[in-house]
């Protein structure tokens, strides 16, 4: 007879293959992929590339072509290496469900590729709202994270890592169920902001964005602390 507990543990664990050297190297190379794309487009790209936008999508900072192509991917690659090291040295990495691990490994490369491709499209004259795109990407990302939050097991890398969650499995589980809901709501609101970006004023957009994401972050920690005080 098949052991259901064993199956559950295998399904919800992160073995070394999930953070293998080959996957780590591929993810870092993927983060640097925009450099290759930029070099391929070098002769077509203008001498200056847009690298920063205001709330309404107006370009408010330009960089040289070389800066625009190299700086962001290189910085993101450094961040990606830090993420990989943190995942690898986590003493509780065996407890992390493999899907959240994959999300953690690939979120930086995917965002880097998306943002840089959008920069190239805009630089080449494409009519794309970077603000709308960023809010939409953040929204999808938060909805994805929110769906995986309740499945996270205790670890030191992914999730709400405060003393109360790390010291109590019950606190961890309840906190991440609540955080999952908050993240999904925040993601939906971010997508709505993206769709209404041309309607909302700059001030309203900033206020809604800040309130939603502060409530998501602080609310998750506050709920964890409340559980600690109530349940010990």
Regions found by a protein language model. Name each.
Residues 23-28, 68-75, 83, 101-110, ...:
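Select subsegments of transmembrane alpha-helices in polytopic membrane proteins
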Residues 25-39, 75-85, 113-116, 141-143, ...:
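Hydrophobic core of alpha-helical transmembrane segments in multi-pass integral membrane proteins
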Residues 27-28, 61-76, 128-145, 211-212:
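Alpha-helical transmembrane segments
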Residues 85-132:
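Ordered, amphipathic secondary-structure segments that act as subunit-interaction surfaces
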Residues 31, 154-231:
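Terminal transmembrane helical module of multi-pass membrane proteins
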Residues 1-17:
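Short, Lys/Arg-rich, polar N-terminal cytosolic tail immediately upstream
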Residues 38-70, 158-167:
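Active-site and channel-lining beta-strand-loop segments
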Residues 40-45, 77-89, 144-160, 223-230:
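Membrane-water interface of transmembrane alpha-helices
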């Amino acid at each position: 007879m098949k052991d259901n507990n064993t199956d559950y543990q295998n399904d919800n664990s992160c073995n070394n293959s999930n953070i293998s050297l080959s996957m780590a190297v591929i993810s870092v190379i993927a983060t640097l992929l925009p450099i290759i794309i930029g070099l391929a487009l070098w002769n077509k790209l203008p001498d200056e590339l847009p690298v920063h936008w205001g709330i309404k999508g107006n370009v408010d900072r330009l960089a040289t072509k070389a800066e625009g192509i190299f700086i962001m991917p290189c910085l993101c690659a450094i961040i990606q290496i830090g993420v990989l090291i943190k995942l690898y040295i986590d003493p509780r990495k065996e407890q992390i469900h493999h899907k959240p691990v994959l999300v953690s490994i690939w979120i930086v490369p995917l965002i880097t590729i998306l943002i840089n491709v959008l920069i190239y499209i805009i630089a080449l004259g494409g009519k794309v709202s970077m603000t709308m795109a960023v809010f939409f990407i953040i929204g999808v990302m938060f909805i994805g994270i929110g769906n995986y939050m309740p499945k996270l097991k205790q670890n030191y890398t992914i999730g709400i890592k405060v003393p109360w969650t790390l010291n109590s499995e019950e606190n961890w589980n309840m906190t991440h169920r609540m955080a999952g809901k908050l993240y999904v709501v925040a993601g939906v609101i971010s997508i709505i902001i993206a769709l209404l970006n041309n309607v909302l004023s700059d001030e309203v957009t900033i206020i809604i964005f800040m309130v939603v994401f502060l409530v998501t972050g602080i609310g998750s920690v506050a709920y964890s602390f409340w559980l600690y005080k109530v349940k010990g």
